């Protein structure tokens, strides 16, 4: 009986250690000024860092390139000229390091619409029925000294995050 309890305890601990971080998954970015959905995102971990790719956009057609971006940015995780990469499928959020559960910082986010790069911090906000009606991701981009803006993204699924194309 002690062996069974011990094994149960070990598996329970292992489950907590290897559980996905709540920021991982599919999200819909919401414009903080208009309240409209702008894009579907996949947020994921790779090599201990956090990344985010656009899966679809509500305003741009499939296959649109990031023509307003520079050819390169510091620490960008994909080789090649960024200005000729597609908006969908490119990791515009990259290099974030884990803080406590649900908090990531120290990376960058590039706005593919204008090519601007910002320091990035992502914080998971669980649904509380008051301020956060659903699970929410606070996506903060800063130029430095705490100057920046936050967007609050809604939890989604892969199908919804992938199907926003206007065409």
Where are these regions (language model features)?
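N-terminal helix-cap/turn-to-beta initiation motif at the start of protein domains
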Residues: 17-26
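Short polar/acidic secondary-structure junctions
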Residues: 32-34, 112, 127-129, 142-145
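Low-complexity, intrinsically disordered Gly/Pro/Thr-rich segments
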Residues: 133-142
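Edge beta-strand at a domain terminus
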Residues: 141-167
């Amino acid at each position: 009986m002690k062996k069974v309890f011990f094994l149960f305890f070990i598996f329970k601990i292992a489950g907590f250690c290897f559980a996905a971080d709540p920021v991982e998954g599919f999200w819909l970015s919401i414009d903080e000024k208009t309240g409209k959905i702008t894009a579907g995102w996949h947020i994921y971990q790779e090599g201990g860092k956090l990344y985010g790719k656009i899966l679809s956009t509500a305003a741009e057609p499939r296959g649109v390139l990031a023509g307003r971006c520079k050819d390169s940015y510091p620490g960008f995780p994909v080789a090649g000229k960024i200005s000729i990469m597609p908006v969908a499928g490119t990791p515009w959020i990259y290099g974030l390091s884990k803080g406590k559960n649900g908090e990531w910082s120290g990376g960058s986010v590039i706005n593919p619409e204008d090519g601007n790069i910002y320091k990035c911090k992502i914080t998971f906000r669980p649904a509380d029925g008051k301020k956060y009606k659903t699970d929410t991701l606070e996506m903060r981009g800063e130029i430095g000294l705490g100057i920046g803006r936050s967007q609050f993204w809604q939890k989604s699924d892969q199908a919804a995050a992938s199907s926003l194309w206007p065409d």
